[in-house]
């Protein structure tokens, strides 16, 4: 994403890891239940992977979204970048990135989806309306505004 410390895309292979590291990636979030990632290459290039196995065409759990958001923050706050992927980089991974934008930039789900779609037009439509995204947004608001009650 232009201007952001996050890269969103499809599953990487061992041959992709040197390039990811060269552009500042220090962490990878792998949303694929069906793919463990190029673990040896990550170790060789000192890239930390967070594996949040999620079945294709289903949204990640709220717990996994929070784990992903915290992982991104950890790497970004240390000066790194994070590559977030699922198989195609359109659904599972885009959901985590959308929630990080809500968390870090204070966007609404609709604003985050519009921002993401502008930079990656082929993400799945309707991510902002996913129940888990709405729940994440409500919990974000409740943390930052004591008059809001999470439902």
What function would you assign to each model-found segment?
Residues 2-82, 102-144:
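Cysteine-based protein phosphatase catalytic domain of the PTP/DSP
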Residues 76-98:
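A phosphate-binding catalytic loop at a beta-strand-loop-alpha-helix junction
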Residues 145-151:
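Intrinsically disordered, low-complexity regulatory segments
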């Amino acid at each position: 994403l232009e201007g952001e410390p996050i890269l969103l895309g499809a599953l990487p292979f061992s041959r992709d890891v040197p390039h990811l590291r060269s552009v500042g990636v220090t962490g990878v979030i792998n949303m694929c239940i069906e793919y463990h990632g190029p673990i040896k290459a990550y170790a060789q290039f000192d890239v930390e992977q967070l594996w949040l196995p999620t079945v294709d065409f289903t949204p990640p759990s709220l717990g996994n979204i929070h784990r992903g958001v915290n992982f991104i923050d950890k790497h970004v706050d240390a000066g790194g970048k994070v590559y977030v992927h699922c198989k195609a980089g359109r659904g599972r991974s885009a959901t985590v990135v959308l929630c990080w934008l809500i968390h870090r930039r204070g966007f609404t789900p609709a604003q985050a989806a519009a921002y993401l779609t502008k930079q990656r037009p082929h993400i799945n439509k309707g991510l902002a309306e996913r129940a888990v995204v709405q729940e994440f947004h409500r919990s974000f608001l409740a943390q930052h505004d004591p008059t809001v009650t999470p439902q």
